C-alpha cells in the first residue's frame, strides 16, 4: 500500500463548499444492525462527505467495526472512515487492523489514543509493545500508506491537557505526524470551537477542523457523555432544555433547536462543515437539516 495516492477525506473537505458527515457505532445485535441500516438508508440521500464508525473501548468492537465499515464501502455510495485506537493493541496488531481495513475497501482512518483501559479519568498506560499517543498512531498509518488519516480535537481542551495551549500543541504534533483533518469532541458553544480554531491557526495548525455536533434528545444521557469527557453541558443549555422536563416531546424540540442554532452560528462563522454524532438514529439529524434548510 505504500506510495498509493488516496483521494481522502481531507481532500474532500478542502474541495467541497461545506462538509456534512455522520458518525455511527458498531451494533451489538441483530436489532442494532437493523437500526443502523435504517439510519444509513435515511441519511445516504443527503450525500454526506463521509461517514465514520467508532471503535469500542479497548478494541472491544474491532472485528465489528471493520466489518460494518467495509459493508458501507461495498454496499453504499458513502465514503466510510474507520476509527482506530491505541488501547489494548500492540504495534503489530494495529498494523494488522489497518491491513484489514484496506482489504475491506476502507481507506480513511480516524487515529485516536483512546480512553485509558480502566475508563476515562484514570491513569493512562500504554499496552506493552504498543503505541503511547495518537501522533504515533498517525505516523504508523502514514508509514503503512494508502490511507487518509484524521484525528480528534477538543474545543474545551482534553481532560489530560495542562492548558488549552498545551492541547493545541498536541494537535499540531498530530498534524506534523501526517493528520489531514480533525473532528472535534462534542461542545455546545460556538465560541469554544472558534477559540480552538484561532489558537490552532496561531500555533500553525492549518488542517480543516470539523465541529462535532451532538443533538440533545435526552438531556441526562448527553450530560453523562459530557462528564465522561471531563466537562459539563453549559448551564444555559441545561436550563433551556430542562425547562421542559416532564414533556419528552418538548425536551426533544428544545434540544434540536439548540443544536440547529449552534450549527447556523458555526457555518456563518466559517466552519468547513458539520459532523453529527447520530447514535445510530437519523431523526434528530434530519430535523436539524430541516431547520438549516439543507437540500439534496
Cite the ranges covered by each PLM segment.
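N-terminal amphipathic alpha-helix/helix-capping segment at the start of soluble metabolic enzymes
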Residues: 1-22, 29-30, 34, 142, ...
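Active-site mouth loops of central-metabolism enzymes
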Residues: 19-35, 57, 80-92, 148-166, ...
Amino acid at each position: 500500500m505504500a506510495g498509493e495516492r488516496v483521494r481522502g477525506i481531507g481532500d474532500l473537505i478542502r474541495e467541497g463548499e461545506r462538509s456534512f458527515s455522520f458518525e455511527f457505532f458498531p451494533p451489538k445485535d441483530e436489532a442494532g444492525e437493523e437500526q443502523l441500516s435504517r439510519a444509513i438508508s435515511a441519511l445516504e440521500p443527503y450525500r454526506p462527505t463521509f461517514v465514520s464508525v467508532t471503535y469500542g473501548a479497548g478494541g472491544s468492537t474491532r472485528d465489528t467495526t471493520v466489518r460494518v465499515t467495509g459493508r458501507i464501502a461495498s454496499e453504499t455510495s458513502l465514503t466510510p472512515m474507520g476509527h482506530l485506537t491505541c488501547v489494548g493493541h500492540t504495534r503489530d496488531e494495529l498494523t494488522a487492523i489497518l491491513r484489514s481495513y484496506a482489504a475491506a475497501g476502507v481507506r480513511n482512518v480516524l487515529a485516536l489514543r483512546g480512553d485509558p483501559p480502566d475508563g476515562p479519568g484514570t491513569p493512562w498506560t500504554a499496552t506493552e509493545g504498543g503505541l503511547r499517543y495518537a501522533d504515533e498512531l498517525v505516523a504508523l498509518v502514514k508509514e503503512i500508506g494508502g490511507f487518509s488519516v484524521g484525528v480528534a480535537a477538543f474545543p474545551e481542551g482534553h481532560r489530560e491537557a495542562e492548558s488549552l495551549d498545551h492541547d493545541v500543541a498536541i494537535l499540531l504534533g498530530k498534524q506534523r505526524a501526517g493528520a489531514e483533518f480533525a473532528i472535534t469532541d462534542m461542545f455546545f458553544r460556538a465560541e469554544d470551537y472558534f477559540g480552538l480554531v484561532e489558537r490552532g491557526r496561531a500555533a500553525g495548525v492549518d488542517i480543516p477542523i470539523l465541529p462535532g455536533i451532538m443533538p440533545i434528545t435526552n438531556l441526562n444521557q448527553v450530560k453523562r457523555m459530557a462528564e465522561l469527557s471531563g466537562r459539563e453541558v453549559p448551564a444555559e443549555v441545561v436550563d433551556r432544555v430542562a425547562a421542559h422536563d416532564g414533556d419528552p416531546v418538548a425536551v426533544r424540540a428544545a434540544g434540536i433547536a439548540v443544536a440547529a442554532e449552534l450549527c447556523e452560528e458555526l457555518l456563518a462563522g466559517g466552519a468547513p462543515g458539520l459532523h453529527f454524532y447520530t447514535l445510530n438514529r437519523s431523526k434528530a439529524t434530519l430535523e436539524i437539516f430541516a431547520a438549516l434548510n439543507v437540500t439534496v
